[in-house]
Each structure stands twice: as structure tokens, then as C-alpha cells.
Amino acid sequence: MVNFTVDEIRGLMDKKRNIRNMSVIAHVDHGKSTLTDSLVSKAGIIAGAKAGETRFTDTRKDEQERCITIKSTAISMYFEVEEKDLVFITHPDQREKECKGFLINLIDSPGHVDFSSEVTAALRVTDGALVVVDCVSGVCVQTETVLRQAIAERIKPILFMNKMDRALLELQLDAEELYQTFQRIVENVNVIIATYNDDGGPMGEVRVDPSKGSVGFGSGLHGWAFTLKQFSEMYSEKFKIDVVKLMNRLWGENFFNAKTKKWQKQKEADNKRSFCMYILDPIYKVFDAIMNYKKEEIGTLLEKIGVTLKHEDKDKDGKALLKTVMRTWLPAGEALLQMIAIHLPSPVVAQKYRMEMLYEGPHDDEAAIAVKSCDPDGPLMMYISKMVPTSDKGRFYAFGRVFAGKVATGQKCRIMGPNYTPGKKEDLYEKAIQRTILMMGRYVEAIEDVPSGNICGLVGVDQFLVKTGTITTFKDAHNMKVMKFSVSPVVRVAVEPKNPADLPKLVEGLKRLAKSDPMVQCIIEESGEHIIAGAGELHLEICLKDLEEDHACIPLKKSDPVVSYRETVSEESDQMCLSKSPNKHNRLLMKALPMPDGLPEDIDNGDVSAKDEFKARARYLSEKYDYDVTEARKIWCFGPDGTGPNFILDCTKSVQYLNEIKDSVVAGFQWASKEGILADENLRGVRFNIYDVTLHADAIHRGGGQIIPTTRRCLYAAAITAKPRLMEPVYLCEIQCPEVAVGGIYGVLNRRRGHVFEENQVVGTPMFVVKAYLPVNESFGFTADLRSNTGGQAFPQCVFDHWQVLPGDPSEPSSKPYAIVQDTRKRKGLKEGLPDLSQYLDKL
């Protein structure tokens, strides 16, 4: 059944120029898993007839039931590429001489936006991405999100237009319309690529181009696909033209005039577009003959395209026959394989330009150089991007990629978590690796050792890492950079066991859940509640199901989903706030003000951060936000956690001993910005100015115990006097629906405080795309509500987009924010009612 053995794969692992690490990414339901099947069947892992229905990479039971991919799954496959195709691989680092075998490590990733953290984990360990787009619905919001992530990680995309069978059979598009649809999708994808890619960057040309062969067309369900290369090979003998020249002619504004036998650039009466005439017409003829049961035509057509049917296939007709014919004529596995081998980079090529994005340390130390040259004899550098649960309850494989060196069974190495800093001991373990394994979709195979440029799993590392980390043998190595997720966990649920005696099991289960999902957060509140935070309703539902059935194995009680809020201020403090230390010898004077719009987002994106050179940062702030340069240079720190979207500014004039209390003030600020004044939520977009400090001359009277609580009280007083407000998270919703259902969408959104900001028709189809902002708080049950109001015709996708201020004053008992604040305070076990200013403000 399988065309290769583990030994063959191990042999290929050393030929690093013939390795391709790639992931399949796309919008939800555009056919990633189905398409992956045709590659898997080409490798001989599943039977060809089953391809397109098996969805081999959907390994979990709930994935099969819901027909969605939830976890990304890896699989390694061995292929041989024919001599005539090897000619197209021109770069010397893209293939080994005298070797036809290619090793393709493929990761099938989920398309649903709630699981986009899985996509991030998959992208980190791969070098190329196959972007699948449904040619009927075009480029959607999730396509754009994952493509943007891929380009930020410096991953080279190739494009595949899926579901061509729908365009022909359901929509009945004619050839010219179909060409225009393709043309539009290619343009859209290239616009996204150009927006996020720096031109003249180290990756070279990343835009996709059908005439170069980096765009495929076909149908994953029916198992057929082609690139222009396949067709131009068929025609090159007939026309006696070079294959590459012909590929350029088969796309774009090229027309062939049958009467004069000449190529032309303009459309005239007698000529047809070459793509339609030479590629789409034969396909249309085959579809037409078979679907309309024209027996005589079928025979002559099959002879022309060179397809001979097997004996058992001769009795088929209709769709079954169509599938068989198209599959024999244009096998999908072959077309995809050629695209992957020719256009995606090998680890040798990719690590040259990805090293600086991946490695935190200096770019000239031993580890960095080994990663850059993908050197199997250098020190081991491996990044673990996620944990995969094993059949053995509670144990995990660590799944990741070897960037340099070799990882072997029984090898001793340093396991570094994300908080490790070189030279310190925290988050660092020195342990031996129990086993190295090869991931094969639903199965794993044991393997002795794995050299650089490959993807593998490790056994026995899971006790030392939570989710991600770096494994190395080089003692001065820095960490690989932490992954940036495009969504953030904003929806929370409190869980407790139905039987209180099961509490230890729940805690154990939460630990395992935190391991198995790259993004979920498990928090224990001060009131003793266990909170799970996820990206959205679906993500939480899957997490809770996993927790109940696999990780904790006990019945649970779940609260209703709750949304995380942020606190902010709406204007400058109306008075100077003074606080005295407990021993009355030190005084602080401060005010709070809101940041200008856009600055908190800049801090979140890392455009302004604590690591920046302070003069450059001050220049940026003064140019973009009109900050005073001298003040902007004196940002003491960001918070919460040293990176959050609030900061404290030193506006004092010549104060004695100021630097000695800086650490204490910063500590107080981190505390205050993590637990805001209204409901103990994080602060966002607040700038605190320190105006004056009076300190005791004796160092012993101005220690941390005096300054930290004083700072916190002063910050709270400043926040209360600056009109505090609540901020809520907002989803960007993209809804696809037919024209008749658009009215129903507006109704549902208006009831839920949402508003539509863009609506357009997908050209060439009756579908509309509506984009709207919807507060997360109102999004529970939104999908069900929407479907019942539109007769099940609308499909929403919600992505966390931004934070916005909740209208209303939290101090007025009749307002909505007041109710939310009281609910939150009650849930967290805080005193009812808002805190009084007099607790925090002191008199001179």
C-alpha cells in the first residue's frame, strides 16, 4: 500500500535540497483537506478512488463529524519527480544532483478563524504555503489573514484555484467569464502579497503568476488539476514551440487567429483568447459530452486527449465517468507535486532569509550561522511550535522543526521555554530526548535521528515545555522568537467540577488543555475560579469538549461565556493627584490622560515598544502624534507586563534621588495597569505623567515598601479623576449570502449593536459579501440567529478586530457600563459599588 519505507525517508532527510516543508492554508471550507488527499493518494497512503472523500488529515472524530479541520496535522511523503520536470528547477540549492526523490512534509491547517493560532504554529515550521482559493467565492477575509501571516513569517506562497467543477456544473460560466474570475483572484492575491511584502526584500519575487506555473487550477473533490505547464507540454510538440515560451502565451492578453495562424495582442473578430481556446475549451468539451451523455463524442474525445479507460470504468456514466476521465487525464497529485517541487523553496534557500525573523540572539553567533546555512553538523537548534496529544492520556509529542544540527534518540540537550534569557537559569532544563518520531497523519513512525531542515516529533519533552520552546545543544543559544497570533483570546468561561472532590483532576486537565492548544489561556482568579479564555465561541466549545472528554475526564459545570474588557480614561485628570507614603515622608504628584487614537494599536503591533532606542522612539511619537520630544524621551516603562499599551512619563524638573525610586514606581505602575480601578481589568491607552516627587533624604525611609503602594494609590486617583471608561472588544464580521438574504442580516446586526460598513457583490456570482463590526459581547448565538433569519443562507466569519469605548459613564447607576462593572466586581469578589476617590487622594 505505502510506496516507501521509513529508511527511504531517512535517506532523503540528508539531501536537504530535496526537502520541501509546506503548509496548506485557506479560508474555511475552501477545500484544503480534500485537496491534500490527492497528494496523499499520489504517495500511495490511501487508495486513489477514495481521495477527495477520505480527508485523511482530519484525524479527530469531531473533525470527521463537523467536516471542519480543528488541529493542524503533519504528514511526510516521498515522491519521485521525472527528468523532464527537473529541468525547471534552476536554482542550484533547490535540488541535489543525481537525485530524483523529493521529501515533502505537508501540514494541513484549519481554515476556521477561531483556530488561526493553529495556522500560525504550522507556518512557523514550514517554508512554503499552498494557498487554496475557492474560485466561486474568491478571496475572503480568512484568506487574507493567513496570507498576511505567511508573508510576515517570510513564507513563499503558491496559489491553487479549487472547486472548478462548481464553476462549470453549478454556475455554468462560459470560458471568458471563468478566465476573468481567475484573473481577478490572481490580482487580489498579488495585491495582498504586495501590501505586506517589502519589495526588493531577500525573498525575491513572491507574487504568483500563472504563466510561470506558480498557479494551479482544478477540483480537489474530483481529483483533477493542472498548471499551464501541463497544457503547454501537450501542445509544444504539436506547435513545435518551446514549453516556457508557450506558457507565457497561454495566459493574459494573448489571442490566436485561426485564419492567419498568428498571435495577436488585441481581441478581434476571428481570434480567441489562448487560455480559453487551448485550455478551457477541451475541458468544457469533455464536461459537455459526458454530462449530456453523448456516447459517440466521448469516444473520439478520449482518443484525442489520450485517455484509455480501464475495463471496469467503461460502464460508468455521468459524474462518476467524468471523475474517472478527468482524474486519468489531469491527475491532481502530479500537478500539485510539480508546483511544490519547482516553486517552493528548500530549507537551504529559505533559512538564508528566514533566520533573522526566527532567531532572537545576535545574527553572527554560532547558532545563527548554523541556522542560516541549514548545517546538519552545527549545534542543534530546534523550534517546538505545538504539542500533539498521544493515545496515552496526558502525554504529548512535541512537534517542531530542526533548523540546524541533528536531533537523535537519547541525546542530551537544553530545553528552553519562552521566558528563558541567556545566562539565567529560569525556564531551562537539561534533559535527554527519549525518542524521535516521524509524523504521518494518523500514525507515527519511530526514527533514529533527524537532521536539519526536517519536521519531526519528540517524546519525553512535554513535561518541560508548556506550549512552545527551543531545543538546543549550544550553551549560549538564544531563543527562537515567540509566535505572534493574529487573534487574541477575548471570550472567557468559568469552569468547575460538578463533584467538588474532582477539583485536582480539573486542575490537571487544565494543564493538559493549555499544552494541547497554542492559544487557549487557563487562569485562576483570586476568587478561586478557573477561567478558560479562547478566541471565540467555536474555539471555546471545542476546548471545553476536549477538557471534559480527554483531559480531565470528569463532568463539568460551565458558566455563560464572559467577555474580557479593558479600562481607559476619556480626558485629562481634572486636578493634580497627590499621594503620601504610609510614613508620610514621601509625596507623589501625577495626572492621567488618554493616548491619541492609533497609539495603543502601534504599541500592540510593536511599532512603539520598550526595546526601541529612546531617541528614535521619541522622534516617531513627536512626528506621528505631536508629543513633545523632550517628554517623549522620558518614558519610564510600558505596562502591563512591560509591553502593554499604557506608559508612565517623567515630567519632573530636577528632583533629587529620582532614579533611586524608579524601580519602585515602575513596579507600582505594573500593578495598577494590570488591575484597573473599575473592575480589576487591564488598562489600555492611558498615559500617566509624574509631575513632582518629594522624597525623604534617608534611603531607608523611601524603600519599595513605602513607594510601591503610594504609586498605586496615586495612579488610581489619577484614573478616577480622568473620567474612566470601559472598552469592549469588537469583531470584524464577514458574511456571505445571496442577495435576497441581505435584509435579514441588517435586522440581526441592528438588534446586536452591530453596524455594516461595507457591502459588495462578488462579480460573476449572485453572492453578496457584507462586512460589519459586531461587539464580542453581543456575538453569542449570533450564527444561529443569523441563519434562522436568512433561511440558512448566510455564512458569517468573525475575527477579533479592535477595542472600542463602551458609550456611557460607569459611575451613573442607569448606564450599561455600570451594570457590566457591577457584574464583573461581583464575579471577582470585590466590594460592590465604585471605589471612592477619598481612599486614594491625600491632602497636603
From Swiss-Prot:
Which residue ranges does the record assign to the tr-type G domain? 17-348
Of which family is this protein a member?
Belongs to the TRAFAC class translation factor GTPase superfamily. Classic translation factor GTPase family. EF-G/EF-2 subfamily.
| PTMs per UniProt | Phosphorylation by EF-2 kinase completely inactivates eEF2.
**Sites where the protein binds GTP:** 26-33, 162-165, 219-221
Q: Extract one GO cellular component term from the record.
A: ribonucleoprotein complex
Role, per record: Catalyzes the GTP-dependent ribosomal translocation step during translation elongation. During this step, the ribosome changes from the pre-translocational (PRE) to the post-translocational (POST) state as the newly formed A-site-bound peptidyl-tRNA and P-site-bound deacylated tRNA move to the P and E sites, respectively. Catalyzes the coordinated movement of the two tRNA molecules, the mRNA and conformational changes in the ribosome.
> Where is it mostly found?
cytoplasm
In the record, Phosphothreonine modifications are located at 57, 59
Which spans of this chain does the record mark as coiled coil?
none
Q: What is its EC number?
A: 3.6.5.-
Record-linked SMART domains = EFG_C (SM00838), EFG_IV (SM00889)
Matching Gene3D superfamilies, A to Z? 3.30.230.10, 3.30.70.240, Elongation Factor G (Translational Gtpase), domain 3, P-loop containing nucleotide triphosphate hydrolases, Translation factors
Q: Where in the cell is it found?
A: Cytoplasm
- Source organism per entry reads Drosophila melanogaster
Q: Name one GO molecular function term.
A: translation elongation factor activity
Name this protein carries in UniProt: Eukaryotic translation elongation factor 2
The family database entries (CDD domains) matched by this protein are listed as: aeEF2_snRNP_like_IV (cd01681), eEF2_snRNP_like_C (cd04096), EF2 (cd01885), EF2_snRNP_III (cd16261), EF2_snRNP_like_II (cd03700)
Which chemical reaction does it catalyze? GTP + H2O = GDP + phosphate + H(+)
Cite the entry's keywords alphabetically: Cytoplasm, Elongation factor, GTP-binding, Hydrolase, Nucleotide-binding, Phosphoprotein, Protein biosynthesis
Q: Which GO terms describe its biological process?
A: translational elongation
For whether the record's keyword set contains Cytoplasm, the answer is yes
Keyword Phosphoprotein among record annotations: yes
> Which residues are annotated with the PTM Diphthamide?
701
Recorded hits in InterPro entries, A to Z, give: EFG_II, EFG_III/V, EFG_V-like, EFTu-like_2, G_TR_CS, P-loop_NTPase, Ribosomal_Su5_D2-typ_SF, Ribsml_uS5_D2-typ_fold_subgr
A Pfam family cross-referenced in the UniProt record is: EFG_IV
